[in-house]
A protein has these predicted regions:
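Secretory-pathway/luminal and periplasmic proteins that interact with or process carbohydrate-rich
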Residues: 28-34
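Internal helical hairpin/lid segments
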Residues: 209-221
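Short, well-structured alpha-helical segments
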Residues: 14-25
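Generic N-terminal amphipathic, Lys/Arg-enriched alpha-helix
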Residues: 1-10
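Active-site cofactor/substrate anionic-group-binding motifs, chiefly glycine-
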Residues: 35-89
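Phosphate/diphosphate-binding glycine-rich loops and adjacent basic-rich segments that engage nucleotide
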Residues: 135-205
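A generic, well-ordered mixed alpha/beta core segment in the N-terminal half of proteins
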Residues: 67-157
């Protein structure tokens, strides 16, 4: 597998490379190109710079019976989730509700595989993460909010879970970057140029511009 070999060659151990390459493969399979091979160069850059520890293992602890903490030790978030989710599920089944708080990790990646897996165990799942400012509120031209994606899933009897994953911007920044790479335009209302003008050019949004909130002005609230 290309992704796995590349990750190992740039500082990941076998388990980390296998975990991350599986996520990349599944994102490509599901049509989420912004979380597939597109992400590999950024992972390699982080590994080479030392920002990401490709051999780290998270430390999992219980703050309360319902609160699980995962210190990622500068690993990639998929590794943290691999170790943290079993403890989260166990705590939720024992107490009725539980939270997993993650620190010191890099790039949450796609979140729906994890919320879907939790829902397949009969639990309702909700996940969220923050992102650097990239979204301007309605009427503004400077970024204030992150794209701050969320994902949720819930089980259904004798049916696959309902699963939802979205950025709280008009579009995920990764999708804008993919559109730029492939030469596609984006819908009007996706974002603004660095001068605050509406544009359908993803390059003008990704390179110094800003995204707009999902749902137009209502998304600013």
């Amino acid at each position: 597998h290309l992704a796995k070999k590349t990750l190992i060659a740039n500082g990941c151990d076998e388990e980390t490379a296998d975990t991350l390459s599986t996520l990349i493969k599944n994102a490509e399979r599901d049509g989420s190109l912004s979380h597939g091979l597109f992400r590999l160069p950024a992972y390699v850059s982080g590994l080479k710079s030392g920002k990401i520890n490709g051999k780290a293992r998270p430390v999992i602890s219980k703050l309360t019976p319902s609160v699980v903490k995962a210190d990622g030790k500068n690993s990639l978030a998929p590794m943290v989730l691999k170790y943290g989710i079993p403890e989260l599920v166990k705590a939720a089944k024992e107490n009725g509700v539980a939270v997993l708080a993650i620190t010191n990790s890099h790039h949450m990646a796609a979140m729906w595989p994890e919320t879907e897996a939790i829902a397949e165990q009969g639990l309702v799942a909700f996940a969220c993460t923050s992102y650097k400012p990239a979204v301007a509120p309605a009427g503004a031209i400077k970024p204030l909010f992150g794209t701050n994606p969320i994902s949720f899933a819930w089980p259904r009897k004798n049916k696959p879970p309902v699963v939802y994953d979205m950025a709280t911007a008009s579009m995920a920044m990764g999708e804008v970057q993919v559109a730029k790479r492939e030469g596609h335009k984006v819908p009007i209302g996706t974002g603004l140029t660095k001068d605050g003008k509406e544009t359908t050019d993803p390059g003008e949004i990704a390179d110094g511009g800003v995204l707009l909130p999902f749902g137009g002005y209502k998304g600013s609230g």
